[in-house]
Amino acid sequence: MDFNLNDEQELFVAGIRELMASENWEAYFAECDRDSVYPERFVKALADMGIDSLLIPEEHGGLDAGFVTLAAVWMELGRLGAPTYVLYQLPGGFNTFLREGTQEQIDKIMAFRGTGKQMWNSAITEPGAGSDVGSLKTTYTRRNGKIYLNGSKCFITSSAYTPYIVVMARDGASPDKPVYTEWFVDMSKPGIKVTKLEKLGLRMDSCCEITFDDVELDEKDMFGREGNGFNRVKEEFDHERFLVALTNYGTAMCAFEDAARYANQRVQFGEAIGRFQLIQEKFAHMAIKLNSMKNMLYEAAWKADNGTITSGDAAMCKYFCANAAFEVVDSAMQVLGGVGIAGNHRISRFWRDLRVDRVSGGSDEMQILTLGRAVLKQYR
């Protein structure tokens, strides 16, 4: 197996390094994190590089560069301190619409290409339906040639700024035999109320509660086929979990390098703390976790490019990387000592972000259940 990046991948990675060195992005990220604001200027800079075209097929003007290239770019962005969690819709969001959307829906979403603006997100989670998606209560009901959406969603990412959301709802006309369908909803429609929620980490991407009170839709607003909602979101979940895992690795690598530089410079008892065996042990364990994450992610990316990735693979990446990355950042914070927990060091942001990732995008427990079933299924 060749672990070297090809020329195209090297070019992308070099471009990322150049962009990250072009200005003091960390000050901008710290400000956006503090104020819970989407870093649109940074995302626009990435879009100008073509990052939002990485997975778009060539026939639609994209680069069709594949998941291995995406992994290389994501890892480098994270290693250099970028909040890649704000980019989850950037590589795959267009493709979702190219596969499932009507031409009108595709045109609306593709208009955001290259802008850096948030364009859409899925609204699935509800107050009474988190991991148990099947218990959702939001309904769509047909009356007089129109569709009416009623219910509430919670913890919906990006929804404070995005102009469109894809809402999962059940057919109100068949409560005993639920039909789950998705709807493409313009957030400016009457009857929609958005309440922004505060959260511990991932603060540059909004998290909101959304209520729908007789929101009027048309049949043309259906996203995909009626009754196919669950099948589509399963694919979206796998894609999201892989991207979350990539983000986890990059963030952990950045914290590791920050701590390593500090350990070689910080002098106590007459020598650099990096010469103490207890500190060296921490770095040995961190390096093992980082290398394991990297190899797992590149294997998953290769499988994605070759059409063999499974939900079990995505769950494994999400669970292992979320936990290993949090452990790395926690150890790095311990090495930094007071510097890490006081003042404005970015590691405190990393720590908060990674703790949230063990819940968002699918909890640790759900990943274990998914993976356990997938493993045993291979031996039936």
Curated annotation (Swiss-Prot):
Protein's cellular compartments: Cytoplasm
Subunit structure: Homotetramer.
Alphabetized GO MF terms: acyl-CoA dehydrogenase activity; flavin adenine dinucleotide binding
Protein name as annotated: Crotonobetainyl-CoA reductase
Assigned GO CC terms: cytoplasm
InterPro entries hit by this protein: Acyl-CoA_DH_CS (IPR006089), Acyl-CoA_Oxase/DH_mid-dom (IPR006091), Acyl-CoA_Oxase/DH_mid-dom_sf (IPR046373), AcylCo_DH-like_C (IPR036250), AcylCo_DH/oxidase_C (IPR009075), AcylCoA_DH/ox_N (IPR013786), AcylCoA_DH/ox_N_sf (IPR037069), AcylCoA_DH/oxidase_NM_dom_sf (IPR009100)
Keyword Flavoprotein on entry: yes
Residues passing through the membrane, by range: none
Pathway annotation: Amine and polyamine metabolism; carnitine metabolism
Cross-referenced PANTHER family: ACYL-COA DEHYDROGENASE, ISOVALERYL-COA DEHYDROGENASE, MITOCHONDRIAL-RELATED
Gene Ontology biological process terms, A to Z: carnitine metabolic process; fatty acid beta-oxidation using acyl-CoA dehydrogenase
Gene (name only): caiA
Residues making up the signal peptide according to the UniProt record: none
Source organism superkingdom: Bacteria
